[in-house]
C-alpha cells in the first residue's frame, strides 16, 4: 500500500509539472506555425479533469475534510433515539440520501433561533433613588472584608501613629508655652531691671544735685564770713 501511494503521488507531481508549462509556438525552418490551430486539448487549462484552479490532490483532500467536519457540526439531529421506521404508503418520503458516509438516516430539522434576551424595564424616577441606594448598600464592601487580618494590622498601626502624633503635638505645644512664659518672664525682668536702673540713675542725679546745692550754700556762707571778718578788721 505504501509503495502504490508513493507511486500515485509521484505521478500526480509529474502531471502537475507537465501542466505548469504553457505551450509555446514552434518555429519550423525559421517561420512561425500560426496558420493552423491545433485541435489538441490544452492540458494547462485543466478542462478535461475539472481542475481549473490547478490545485494539488492533497489540498483538495484537506478542503474536503474541513467541509465534512463543518457540515457535520452544522447539521443536528432532532430525535437522538433510534426509532424503527413505520411502514407507510408514501415510501418516497422514507427514502432519503446521505451527504457523507458518516451521516445517519433520519429526519432533520433546522434548529430554531434562540429567543432574544429580555431587556430590563426602565426604573421610574420616583423609585430609582431608593433602588439605587439599596443596590449601593448591597454592593458596598469594607476593606476589612477584603483584606482581613492585614486590614486590622494596618488600622492598628494607623491608630498608633495617630496617638504618637497627638502626644508629640501636645508635647511640642507645652514646650512652646513654656518657652513663651520664660521669654515673657525674661522680658519682664529686663523691663524691671531697666526701670530699676533708671530709678537708680534718677536717685543718683537727685543726690548729686542736693550735694551740689549744699556745697554752694557752704561756699556762700564762707564768703559771707570772710567779708564780715574783713569789715571787722577795717573798723579796728
From Swiss-Prot:
Presence of keyword Transmembrane: no
Statement: the UniProt record of this protein carries the keyword Nucleus: yes
UniProt motif Nucleolar localization signal (NLS1): location: 173-181
Gene Ontology BP term (one): Spemann organizer formation
Biased composition (Basic and acidic residues): 10-51, 156-165, 182-196
Chain positions covered by the region annotation Disordered: 1-57, 83-236
Any one Gene Ontology cellular component term annotated for this protein: nuclear envelope
Annotated keywords: Developmental protein, Nucleus, Wnt signaling pathway
Motif placement: Nucleolar localization signal (NLS2): 211-219
Basic residues bias locations: 214-227
InterPro entries from the UniProt entry: CUSTOS
Subcellular location: Nucleus envelope
Effect of disrupting the coding gene: Morpholino knockdown results in embryos with small eyes, head, and brain structures.
Record's compositionally biased regions (Polar residues): 197-210
Post-translational modification (record): Phosphorylated by ck1/csnk1a1.
Similarity comment: family membership: Belongs to the CUSTOS family.
Job of this protein: Essential for Spemann-Mangold organizer formation and subsequent anterior head development in the embryo. Inhibits canonical Wnt signaling pathway by antagonizing nuclear import of beta-catenin (ctnnb1) during embryogenesis.
Misc. comment: Named Custos for the Latin term for 'guard' or 'keeper'.
Known partners and oligomeric status: Interacts (via NLS1 and NLS2) with dvl2; the interaction is negatively regulated by Wnt stimulation. Interacts with csnk1a1. Interacts with ctnnb1; the interaction is positively regulated by Wnt stimulation.
Protein name, as recorded: Protein CUSTOS
Species: Danio rerio
Gene encoding the protein: custos
Amino acid at each position: 500500500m505504501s509503495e502504490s501511494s508513493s507511486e500515485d503521488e509521484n505521478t500526480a507531481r509529474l502531471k502537475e509539472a507537465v501542466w505548469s508549462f504553457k505551450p509555446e509556438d514552434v518555429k519550423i525552418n525559421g517561420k512561425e506555425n500560426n496558420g493552423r490551430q491545433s485541435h489538441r486539448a490544452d492540458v494547462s487549462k485543466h478542462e478535461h479533469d475539472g481542475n481549473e484552479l490547478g490545485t494539488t490532490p492533497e489540498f483538495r483532500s484537506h478542503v474536503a475534510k474541513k467541509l465534512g467536519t463543518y457540515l457535520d457540526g452544522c447539521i443536528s439531529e432532532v430525535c437522538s433515539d433510534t426509532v424503527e421506521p413505520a411502514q407507510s404508503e408514501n415510501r418516497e418520503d422514507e427514502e432519503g440520501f446521505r451527504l457523507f458516509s458518516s451521516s445517519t438516516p433520519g429526519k432533520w430539522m433546522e434548529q430554531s433561533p434562540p429567543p432574544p434576551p429580555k431587556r430590563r424595564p426602565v426604573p421610574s424616577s420616583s423609585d430609582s433613588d431608593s433602588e439605587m441606594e439599596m443596590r449601593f448598600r448591597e454592593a458596598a464592601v469594607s476593606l476589612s472584608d477584603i483584606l482581613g487580618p492585614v486590614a486590622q494590622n494596618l488600622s492598628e498601626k494607623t491608630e498608633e501613629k495617630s496617638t504618637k502624633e497627638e502626644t508629640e503635638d501636645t508635647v511640642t505645644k507645652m514646650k512652646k508655652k513654656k518657652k513663651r512664659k520664660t521669654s515673657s518672664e525674661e522680658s519682664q525682668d529686663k523691663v524691671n531691671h531697666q526701670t530699676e536702673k533708671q530709678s537708680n540713675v534718677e536717685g543718683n542725679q537727685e543726690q548729686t544735685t542736693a550735694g551740689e546745692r549744699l556745697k554752694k550754700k557752704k561756699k556762700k556762707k564762707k564768703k559771707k564770713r570772710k567779708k564780715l571778718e574783713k569789715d571787722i578788721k577795717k573798723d579796728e
